[in-house]
């Protein structure tokens, strides 16, 4: 491996792009404790390429496509299909992702941004994050370095959140169909689920394509839904970030947002075109899913 380049001066540090807060209704109250002192840019780009500034009121999140069929959970009824996000929802993957992110920036001689990196980089496609940091021609080299390091060691710096294994088993016993939709590369997602012994619970595992043609949550969910047809009347997305909510809303699907992930700051004073339920604990998630 080539040695790291000479480090940039601090005045030229790259700036992370932040995703917009997701829209929520108040079926239950979320934890609105936002991380402070990040020193990161307030200007960000969401999964659909919409640029928003957090210093302004409101957001520019696009509405769901007109053709999107309304397929959501019904009040008082358990879902028939649950689609899970991976990072921050099923597994605590922040340590490995942050470690490989640091490695990628060190490799090209770029300083690592200050602040809570997990809050800003875990969830969306890493190639989008790196390309939005103002790294210029070095962005592609950083992406290659990140992928190599994450494939070699970062993926294993990971753990299953407490209670996830039994929850999945109970959902399957109850006859609920299960799937995964993640912006992580699909082969890596399968590797992680297999490593934790939970791959067999999922009818479909949909992730980002390795050629970069499919990466946004909207596209990954479309890929998953196409494989899950015919779709039942009651289905729900379970995730931890705003792009999970926005991606599901684009397909007319409600979301349960878990409180143990990395997106607490995404859900402050916003509304949604679909229902957003907040589950702070695994027991609350069980209640929301009817098991």
Swiss-Prot record:
Catalytic activity field: L-tyrosyl-[protein] + ATP = O-phospho-L-tyrosyl-[protein] + ADP + H(+)
- Biased-composition ranges for Polar residues? 23-60
Q: What is the effect of changing residue 146 to A?
A: Does not affect autophosphorylation
Bridged cysteine pairs (disulfide)? none
List GO molecular-function terms, semicolon-separated: ATP binding; protein tyrosine kinase activity
Q: Which InterPro entries match?
A: HAD-like_hydrolase_sf, HAD-like_sf, HAD_2, HAD_sf, PGP-like_dom2
> What is the organism field in this record?
Mycobacterium tuberculosis (strain ATCC 25618 / H37Rv)
Region Disordered: list its residue ranges. Answer: 1-79
> What does the function comment of this entry state?
Required for growth within macrophages. Catalyzes the phosphorylation of PtpA on the tyrosine residues at positions 128 and 129, thereby increasing PtpA phosphatase activity and promoting pathogenicity. Also phosphorylates the thioredoxin reductase TrxB.
Q: Which family does it belong to?
A: Belongs to the HAD-like hydrolase superfamily. CbbY/CbbZ/Gph/YieH family.
User: What regulates the activity here?
Assistant: Activity is increased by phosphorylation.
* This protein's record includes keyword DNA repair: no
- By its UniProt entry, which Gene3D superfamilies does this protein fall under? HAD superfamily/HAD-like, Putative phosphatase, domain 2
State the EC number(s): 2.7.10.-
GO cellular-component term (any): cytosol
What effect on the protein does mutating residue 184 to M have, as reported in its record? Decreases affinity for ATP and autophosphorylation efficiency
> Gene for this protein?
ptkA
Q: Does the keyword Transferase apply?
A: yes
Maturation and modification: Autophosphorylated. Can be phosphorylated in vitro on threonine residues by several mycobacterial eukaryotic-like Ser/Thr protein kinases (eSTPKs), including PknA, PknD, PknF and PknK. PknD and PknK can enhance PtkA autophosphorylation activity in vitro. Phosphorylated in vitro on serine residues by the eukaryotic serine/threonine kinase PKA.
Record remark: domains: Composed of two domains: the N-terminal highly flexible intrinsically disordered domain (IDD) and the C-terminal rigid kinase core domain (KCD). IDD is unstructured and highly dynamic, allowing transient interactions with the rigid KCD. This interaction modulates the accessibility of the KCD active site. In closed state, IDD masks the autophosphorylation site, thereby decreasing the activity of PtkA. In open state conformation, IDD is away from the autophosphorylation site, making it accessible for phosphorylation and activation of PtkA.
Descriptive protein name = Tyrosine-protein kinase PtkA
Industrial or biotech use: PtkA-PtpA (TK-TP) interaction could be a good target for drug discovery program. Benzylbenzofurans and benzofuranamides disrupt the PtkA-PtpA interaction, which inhibits activation of PtpA and leads to the decrease in intracellular survival of mycobacteria.
Q: What is the effect of changing residue 270 to M?
A: Decreases affinity for ATP and autophosphorylation efficiency. Decreases interaction with PtpA
Q: How changing residue 85 to A affects the protein?
A: Significant decrease in ATP binding affinity and autophosphorylation efficiency. Decreases interaction with PtpA
């Amino acid at each position: 491996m080539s040695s790291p380049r000479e480090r940039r001066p601090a005045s030229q540090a790259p700036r992370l792009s932040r995703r917009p807060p997701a829209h929520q209704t108040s079926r239950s109250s979320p934890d609105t404790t936002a991380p402070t002192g990040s020193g990161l840019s307030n200007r960000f780009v969401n999964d659909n390429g919409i640029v928003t500034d957090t210093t302004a009121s409101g957001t520019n999140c696009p509405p769901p496509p007109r053709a999107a069929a309304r397929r959501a959970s019904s009040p008082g009824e358990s879902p028939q299909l649950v689609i899970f996000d991976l990072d921050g929802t099923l597994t605590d993957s922040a340590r490995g992702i942050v470690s490989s992110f640091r490695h990628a920036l060190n490799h090209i001689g770029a300083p690592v941004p200050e602040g809570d990196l997990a809050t800003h980089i875990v969830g969306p496609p890493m190639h989008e994050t790196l390309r939005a940091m103002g790294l210029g021609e070095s962005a592609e080299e950083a992406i290659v370095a990140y992928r190599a390091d994450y494939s070699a060691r970062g993926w294993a710096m990971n753990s299953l959140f407490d209670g996830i294994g039994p929850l999945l088993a109970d959902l399957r016993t109850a006859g609920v169909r299960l799937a995964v939709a993640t912006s992580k590369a699909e082969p890596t997602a399968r590797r992680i689920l297999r490593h934790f012994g939970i791959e067999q619970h999922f009818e479909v595992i949909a992730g980002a394509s390795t050629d970069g043609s499919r990466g946004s949550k909207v596209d990954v969910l479309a890929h998953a839904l196409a494989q899950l047809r015919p779709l039942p009347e009651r289905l729900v997305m379970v995730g931890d970030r705003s792009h999970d909510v926005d991606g599901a809303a684009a397909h007319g699907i409600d979301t349960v947002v878990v409180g143990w992930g990395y997106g607490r700051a995404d859900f402050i004073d916003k509304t949604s075109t679909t229902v957003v339920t907040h589950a702070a604990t695994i027991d609350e998630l069980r209640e929301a899913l009817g098991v």
